[in-house]
Amino acid sequence: MNPCQIFASLVMSICCHILSSTAWSVNNFLMTGPKAYLAYTSSVQAGAQSGIEECKHQFAWDRWNCPESALQLSTHKGLRSATRETAFVHAISAAGVMYTLTKNCSMGDFENCGCDDSKIGKMGGRGWVWGGCSDNVNFGDRIAKLFVDALENGHDSRAAVNLHNNEAGRLAVKATLKRTCKCHGLSGSCSIQTCWMQLADFRDIGSYLKIKHDQARKLEMDKIRMRAGNSADNRGAIADTFSAVARTELIFMEDSPDYCVKNLSMGLHGTEGRECLQSGKNLSQWERRSCRRLCHECGLKVEERRIETVSSCNCKFHWCCTVKCETCTQTVTRYFCAKRHRNRRPHNHSRKRQHTRRG
């Protein structure tokens, strides 16, 4: 089962099973989803793919690195969790689907959708008017909500948390929109501008949601009222808890497990054997500290390995019409987390640093 299939199923419903013997099918989802929206299935799948790629990028140097095994396990009802990481998965899923639907809409890929022209000709501010082709985020929001939220049919606190994080992901797409303008006027005077709203790069949305993940808020539900199950008391407790939470915030209910330690029952492989970065150009502070975070703070040492890589080089074009290359071997130094000779307990403060914001 490839990453897109695993994550696409997760996008549709965290509570659905992923069958180990068969690939996930968009049609399977649509058996219970909105059948009127068959035209959008390829966009939904593409959005799911962009979601998993962005998740892996954002968490590449974190202890939890968006592993496919953990995503697959989290689709099983008995193994569902409502951690900080699950919150991000829901948000980036919803954002990816909405983003792709919006983009395809603006490109004219759907018969019933195009640019958002609701503001064209209206004054937007001093010296500029609305024009051009604004990305139709309201369309993307509406269809993504139907797809991603449709199968979250529970009425408990976990379902409410998932739906909240889905919405936070969609709001992230809107929050990162950029205004693009074109100048008009004699001799390039730019006396007036025509402006429209454009989707940001999806990487910007991923970074925005990563910050939201780092700042995610833990909910403390009223357990006495929650014992009533799906009763009015249950719904009242959920409503009271959510009343003070901003719609743009990511929320979770359970503390994250110790990602330093291998736990195969949860799909976690620990950080032993993980690569980290110690040097290199244009590294962020978060990347430069990855060896400390993944290795030292998990009771592991940093092991230096010299690895030979083979690649094509000195390529030349020969008339006509071939390109001939030489084969070059290069030795590079890479760093990995490895066991110490003596077992040492991880630093007590390592868990606290786990969700520190990137530098």
Swiss-Prot record:
Gene of origin?
Answer: wnt8a
Tissues with expression: Expressed in the margin of the pregastrula embryo destined to be the future mesoderm.
Q: List the disulfide bonds.
A: C55-C66, C105-C113, C115-C133, C181-C195, C183-C190, C260-C298, C276-C291, C295-C337, C313-C328, C315-C325, C320-C321
| Signal peptide stretch | 1-25
- Taxonomically, the superkingdom here is Eukaryota
Q: Mind listing the UniProt keywords for this protein, alphabetically?
A: Developmental protein, Disulfide bond, Extracellular matrix, Glycoprotein, Lipoprotein, Secreted, Signal, Wnt signaling pathway
Alphabetized PROSITE patterns for the sequence: WNT1
Gene Ontology MF: a single term:
cytokine activity
In this record, residues modified by a lipid of the kind O-palmitoleoyl serine are: S187
Q: What does this protein do?
A: Ligand for members of the frizzled family of seven transmembrane receptors. Required for mesoderm and neural ectoderm patterning during gastrulation. Involved in axis formation during embryonic development, via activation of canonical Wnt/CTNNB1 signaling. May be involved in the specification of the spatial patterns of expression of Gsc and other regulatory genes leading to the establishment of the embryonic axis.
Keyword Secreted included in the entry's annotation: yes
User: Carries keyword Disulfide bond?
Assistant: yes
Which family does the similarity line name? Answer: Belongs to the Wnt family.
Q: Indicate where this protein resides in the cell.
A: Secreted, Extracellular space, Extracellular matrix; Secreted
**Main localization of the protein?**
secreted
Gene Ontology terms: biological process: anterior/posterior pattern specification; brain segmentation; canonical Wnt signaling pathway; cell fate commitment; cell migration involved in gastrulation; cell proliferation involved in pronephros development; central nervous system development; determination of dorsal identity
Q: Which PANTHER family match?
A: PROTEIN WNT-8A (PTHR12027:SF92), WNT RELATED (PTHR12027)
Reported modifications of this chain: Palmitoleoylation is required for efficient binding to frizzled receptors. Depalmitoleoylation leads to Wnt signaling pathway inhibition.
Question: GO cellular component terms?
Answer: apoptotic body; cell surface; extracellular space
Output the InterPro entries linked to this UniProt entry.
Protein_Wnt-8A/8C, Wnt, Wnt8, Wnt_C, Wnt_CS, Znf_C2H2_type
The name of this protein is Protein Wnt-8a
